[in-house]
Amino acid sequence: MTRKTFRLGLMALDGCMLSSLSGPADALRVAQTLGEIRSPNNAPRFESVVFSPRNARRVRTESGIEIGNIKPLGRDPKFDLVLVPGINHHRPGELWHRRAEFEPEFAALRMMHLRGTRIAATCSGTYLLALAGLLDGHRATTSWWMAGSFRRHFPAVLLEEQALMVEDGNIITTGASTAVYSFVLRLIAQVGGEELAQQTSRMMLLDGERQSQAPYVSQALLEKPRHSLSEKITHFLDKQLHNQITVARLASHCGTSERSLLRHFRANYGTSPLGYIQHLRVERAKALLEATQLSFDEVVERCGYSDAPSFRKLFKRETSLTPADYRERFRLRAR
């Protein structure tokens, strides 16, 4: 009996994240080994091929480690799926301004997409798919800290920023960095079955149960709008978050009308004032759950809420975890 071979194409380019390429390749190799132990004659073969649309023989990754033995793409690539890695950059919108650098990658991605090849992108690699026009009209996710910039530059993409992974047709996108492992476990399950994916997950200590980026979002790391009104808003909310805050009170403090304030929030924060205040209160609750032994009722009070059950629902909606589960998962970071 001929064993099935699944070929994963790993797109290499200068400044890419090494783990975006090596992580999936290692996981597939582990899966193949486990499969051969379980069923020597029927286990699927996984082949990982590092290639360059520019026919480069070597690339220097973000960490400074060079990758050699890179294959040229060729005119008729035989990949079952192609993965676009995360790319080094310092600001969320930087790749938009550097888009002219990636024309060879765009051309290759469009060509493979037209031929029906499945394409996946992880972390900031999702930006390349969007810049190539492959995500227009599709559901997608990206690194949570890039979501604001992504939404502004690609309004035709149906962004699900809290999702860890989104599969829409022949296109798969994942969130930040290690979300690539959720993708590769899904891939192993599709090719070799759920049991093989679970065994690989256990062998490599990978969490195959993660569904959302929401628990990891930090407002402190998000891009801040550069505007004098935004600075007034930030200063006021930092000082008053534990108190009751109305749109009228916030507008009065900032010296603007409620209507202008609403427009400013939609344009710069992508949400309403109430939605943004709720985000900040959840952020404060996360910090208190991580770093203190306060009871949940005490946390709720310090976040400006008086209704603990209501805030509990808000917290779970925003983070996908209950407050108790969040504290259990993240409290060790404070020790």
Task: Describe each model-derived feature in a short phrase.
Residues 136-162:
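A conserved active-site-flanking secondary-structure segment within enzyme catalytic domains
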Residues 232, 236-239, 247-280, 300-325:
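Basic/polar phosphate-binding segments, predominantly the helix-turn-helix DNA-binding elements
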Residues 153-191:
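Amphipathic alpha-helical segments enriched in hydrophobic/aromatic residues interleaved with Lys/Arg
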Residues 277-286, 325-335:
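Short, basic, alpha-helical segments at the C-terminal edge of helix-turn-helix-like DNA-binding modules
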Residues 239-243, 291:
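Short helix-capping/hinge SLiMs at alpha-helix to coil transitions
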Residues 2-130:
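N-terminal functional module of multi-domain proteins
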Residues 163-174, 191-235, 239, 252-253, ...:
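Short, Lys/Arg-enriched, Trp-marked, Pro/Gly-tolerant hinge/linker segments that flank
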